[in-house]
Amino acid sequence: MISAGRELNCPHCGFRFFINTAAAAGAFVLRDRQLVLCVRGKDPGRGKLDVPGGFIEFNESLEEGLRREILEELGIEVGELSYLASAPNDYLFAGVPYKTSDVFFRTTASPDVVLVPQDDVSAYQLFDPLRVNPSDFAFESTRQGYLRLVMSLVEEGWT
């Protein structure tokens, strides 16, 4: 195979393969004026903060995939998903670099729901949504999504 950027070409048969980004979605979940954040249980970023979410499966919309991931990781269903931001990300998994396009939504969870960390989430933590240190997030894209969340909350009068 001969590589030309993100395109692989076979000089023998002419087959062409394009390496595209993977889609991922994450949610900033607000519950009773607190932000629910996950602690990553696996690499990349093990032990760092993250939002519930993950890769979108074939034939899923961003919203469907995100709702599935939240259920898998925290065992809860959430309210309406409101778009916040998107950002490119570099995701190094098992030594293989993946380029992803990460989209972030804002949503709510009932204060009565029981959060159960599962899948690749080792724990969850509750934060004042305006007082999270962005450097504690595992990924730069999540930091960018968080800053957009803070801007939207301040615009709404949160202090």
Predicted features along the sequence, with ranges:
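A generic structural micro-feature
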Residues: 19-21, 48, 95-101, 116-121
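Conserved hydrophobic "DFG−1" position in protein kinase catalytic cores
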Residues: 29-30, 37, 107, 126
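Conserved Nudix-box catalytic region and its N-terminal flanking loop in Nudix hydrolases
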Residues: 30-72
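Active-site-adjacent beta-strand/loop module that shapes the phosphate/pyrophosphate-binding cleft
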Residues: 85-113
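Nudix hydrolase/Nudix homology domain
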Residues: 114-159
